[in-house]
Amino acid sequence: MHLQNTHNTMESNAAMDAASPASRDVRQFHDLITCRLCRGYMIDPTTVDYCYHTYCRSCILKHLLRAVYCPECKASGGKEINELNLKSDDTLRSLIYKLVPGLYQRECKELADFKEQHDLVDEQTTDEPEFFTTTELISLSLEYHPAMLHQCGPGEVPPTIYLQCAAGLPVELLKRFLCSKYNIETDNGLVEVEVTYKDEVLPTNFTLMDVAYCYNWSRESPMAFCYRILLYDNEQTKNDENNLSRINQDIEPEHSVRRSKSAKSVTFAEDLESEIDSGSPRSKVRCKTPPKVSPSSKNKRLTSSKREAEPESPVSNFKSLRSNDMRYSDYAVSKVKSEPEQEQFLLPREREQQPLEANTNIVVSIPPSQLRKSYVDAEDFELKTANRKGVGHLPKLKIELNSMKSKLSMPLSAGPRLEDTSCSLSCSAQQLDLETYAKNIGLKPIEQPLQQSASNPDSKYSPNASPMSSCSSSTNGSSSSLGTADASTSTSTSSSHRKRKKKHSKEPKDANGKRKKLHAEISSQTDGKMKVKITAKPNHKLDFKRSHSLASGELDLQKLKLDSTSTSEALNRTLGEEARSINSLVVGGAPTPPPTPTAEPEQQQQQQQQQQQPQQQQQQQQQQQQQQQFVVLPKIKDLTLPTSPPLPPSLFKAYTPSTTPTAPHTVAGGKPKQQQQQMPQQPQAVLQQSLAKTNPAKPPLSSNNNRKPNSGHFAVPQAPTHRNMYHMQRYQSTPSSIASAANKMPKRSMSLDESHPAKQARLSQAQAMASSYAAKLHMQTSNQAKSQAAAFLPNPQMRSYGLPDLGSKPTLPMLCPASSSSQVTITPRPRATPSIYSFSEPNIHVPALEIVRLPVNKQSAGGKGLTMPPLSPPATSSARLMGPPAALPKHAGHGHGAAKRSCQMPTMPMPLPLPLPMPMTTIPAIVKSPPLSVALSGQRNNKGNSSNSNAYRTSPPALINLRNTAAPQHSFPSKSSPKVEANSKKSPPAAGCQGKTNGTAALDKSKTSLREFRPAVQSAVTATATTSVTTAAGAGAGAGTGTGTALAKDADILDLSANPGRSNNDAKLAPNSPPAGNNNNNNNNNNNNNNNNNNNNNNSTSNSLEAALNKIKQNISANSNGGPSTTSGSNSNGTTNGDDLQNLHMLSESATAREKISIKAASSGNGSGSTSSSSAKPKNANALVRPQNASVRSIPNPSALAFRNQPAAASTAASISKPLTVRAEEKPKVSTSNPGSLSPTNTSSSSSSSSSGSSGCSAATSPRAMTKKPTTIDQVAANLNIRAEAKAAALAEEAPPVLSSNAAKSPELAKTTTAVALRPEPKETPITVSAASTLLTIPSAVSSVSAVPETMAKPPVQIANAPVASSA
């Protein structure tokens, strides 16, 4: 049936197309619609479901009374059938009734007669007839198309015509009727009348009955037909359109053609309006004189046709085609109105020549303004007949746009483009098109276009004047400030050298918000590769000679340097352009380094510098533009990048594609910038001051900071936003931005993409942190409030982008030289960076204790320079460890942003021992993690100090609570630890409950909430610490926690890094070995998993942070979590454990970092400590690490995931803080539950947060998590970001440097924790990371907290609560 129907329809259409509406005889379908039993038309066709043969229902039923086989299948042995096998075919029934005129009515009449005869008149359904007869009268109305009415004057609107016609009336007769009404000769080829229904042009062979069937006319109201009169320049246009419509009739019988016509008229409604102003379309139509009618409709058509005709040449103009620019869209408006008819007539002729394309696409291609003119009243005027909008019409649209160019007054910017186009069009339209297209794309240098550009060099290359600029104007518009002089020079160069095409590399706006124009000359002469030459003011002739290599670019740079006398802006622009072109080459994979060898040695160095400097220069240009633009050139001249040269190839390859360009900036770019900045510093004291603030050691960031701190750019409130903006700008400004890779990456906050560069950046961050402390001292002396705020804000921002240098820049000169040179040095610096935190002062108070504790821990003394307030650096790491997870949601990217924010937030928490509760409240989200980290670091440093556990307890519970799900696993009983792990994975509430069960002895209080847990915290601290140690041992990932083995409290904190599975095993073992205050005992219990971890923990309670920082730096440099990364050998084990936590943090910070760290942690065991945990739970750890790496890779934004997990982690940290208070007696229980919870903290689930603390802590954490409801990642990120920014602003002034150290540490933590966290769920890893990083940070905090009474543990807990709320 369906096949038959389709066939019929197709045949009918074909017949209609071929001839008149009645061209198809019903007899052609007889075989399809007649019954084989009665040989008549099938009435109520019924199909046999077996063979699909169709018969009249009455016929087949009668047949079944005699036989049980299908009449057509019986001979072939068909199946037996019965009434159940019969299916009514309503579709075929409808087709038959529609095909056979009068059949339906005859059957209805017969049925009625039959019923009357047999008295079967049951509720006769007097439904309206479903089918029409050719003689049935249909009411209809003819109305002038509303889209054309605007052209008519108030008294010229034609009246609506109402008719009643037979259903068989063809549309052709309606058209003839209209022609007679308006005295239009039907054979007049210049005038056409179109009849539309529902904005679809009807084919002339359609009948009213066809319209009723096709549009489901319901007989409720007259058919509302619309008509319009179209005027053509010549008959050819009409014929072409008619032919097109006929061609399209096969698909949609004339709908497409008339749509095209309507589209034309509609498109040119404005033109018609101008004509109609002279006379209404009807008056024209009414006038027998076709010209009068034609003026209105023809003008419309002519406009469209003219547009079409001219567009052919313009079609070559790629820009006009691509852009819906008003310049192109309104090209013909003014002239059309002034000379509507003439132009329109011309256009119609051209259009007639190209009627098909023009008809279809005019509506679409013409800008809305033009469409309004044509169909002001009805956008729907674009008839539903989309057929006319054919792909073929698109070119005509383009042509129309170009044609319009000549007519319309173009903006100045558009003018040059049009002029170029006109010149090229006059020469060769297609060449111009191709050339323009190539120019726009920037693929090939076009000699002729270059000539044209030479003729109009300035206008063409003015930001908006050139066709190329139109394409790149959006990107280049901001760079216009840089490139006015460059534009002219490059223009002249391009004109002189046709082979070279000057390309404005697209760059994001600079910090100042202006886009720099980089003129890259593409050398077509290059043998196999296109080389981009940065055009500066240097002679392009020389460059042209050297166009094959970048040597010309180098010479240009040298010339620019020599030409320092030229405007500083011009120099900066040139440098920026060169850097960008080099970056683009790097991004594109073009052999930028190869050209370097061709250049002279100095040139090579300069090229390397330039390559490294592209970022540096971009930053410096921005910075120095603010400071002194000429400084950049001296830097470039004198600048030698001894350390950076090794970086450029790898960095550029890795850097250019990755969004981690900040890392290259920091590492490769940073050193060159340092040198450059140092060079300027000597000549300029002012620059030295600003650069000193920015820390030359971290030039890339410092350069950005130089801009910002020097100008006071980073207001505390602004810091997060501007940081992001600057990083984004940098990336955008780099060629990668052209590729849009960098642009995309910033969305992630660079965290994920920083895999290698990020680590390097983090190294820089560690350096920056160290330097930031010195810088903070520096800045305090110079501009404490302002520079601190600037340094602080930049640091978080830099970190978020993997550029910690900004924040720590100020101190980098003092501390960073060694830091940048050696990671170990950096670690002590970050240690000293406590002032970096906004809460550095409280840290300073605690630091004395912390310093003492760190020395107590040989690792801490050796690992990190306690010379600087050690507490702050641990706080920094703690803030970073804790903070980054909290901050991660906002900085989906690398943990640097998170670290920065965490630093910002933790900045407050760092003083947490005393003032932290308030700061935490202020910065709840990020502050959570810092307190936990601070407390953890302090506890690690002072394994035996309850104050450390208090400090830990102060902050970590909040973070732990964030990932409360893991909290239950902290429960002390080893029996419940497995359940705790499971629960921690399940949900914070469950975790909390299990935590209660596990920590029944001393942590039952924590069941209810953190508050309940607080009273037990002191007593539980010992147990928690022991448990932590056990957990760390059991987890093997709880390096930081395990580090506190000497004290159970420290162990608890370290446990956060332990994997849940490990934690359970370790927890079981740990309970066996009493807290004993010995990590070794716990290790003995968990010797397989935790022996190394415990040793590591013992070594690195305080050193864990130091080692973490060292490792972070080493990992950044070596991209490995190996113990050697830790600064101190003794710290290596404990540090690795702490590093595991840090690595977890790193995991949350960046997917790339996670992958590398996890792989390294799995392979190398995260150094001695990580190896212990990895080897302790080796196979699980490694296996989990690899899956996590895979998952991290699969996760687009691991940082975001980390943040999603972060809230729970923060809450977990809070709960952990309390567990720190758990007494040693409870150690076995705590360790039992902690291992499980630690594992979750690492990655399994919220239980990881519990792992940092004792089970009581987990209980507290779970209550917080339950109370708090894990928020969505977006919510947490938003809250954390807002609070972090607010707090960062406040805290930045106090201790921005600490943030740097935290940032430095946190990457390590992330890395170390990565190995641990990798083992559990990848999604959990981010959570674990936050908790672990919080714990790691805590050692520093603990150092500061150590002096703080246990009562301080409660305030930190409160702070943790505030952070939890903020995360929620």
UniProtKB/Swiss-Prot annotation:
Record keyword Ubl conjugation present: no
Residue ranges, annotated region (Disordered): 245-321, 448-628, 640-718, 861-903, 935-1001, 1057-1103, 1116-1141, 1161-1193, 1211-1271, 1298-1322
Subcellular location field: Nucleus
InterPro entries: RAWUL, Znf_C3HC4_RING-type, Znf_RING, Znf_RING/FYVE/PHD, Znf_RING_CS
GO biological process, one term: heterochromatin formation
UniProt-listed Pfam families: RAWUL, zf-C3HC4
Composition skew (Polar residues), residue ranges: 449-461, 936-953, 962-977
GO cellular component, one term: PRC1 complex
GO molecular function: DNA binding; promoter-specific chromatin binding; zinc ion binding
Zinc finger (RING-type): 35-74
Function: Regulates expression of the homeotic selector genes by influencing higher-order chromatin structure through interaction with other proteins.
Tagged with keyword Kinase: no
Basic residues: bias regions: 496-506
Protein name, entry field: Protein suppressor 2 of zeste
Entry keyword set: Developmental protein, DNA-binding, Metal-binding, Nucleus, Zinc, Zinc-finger
Superkingdom to which the source organism belongs: Eukaryota
Compositionally biased spans, kind Low complexity: 462-495, 599-628, 672-689, 1078-1099, 1119-1138, 1161-1183, 1231-1263
Principal place of residence: nucleus
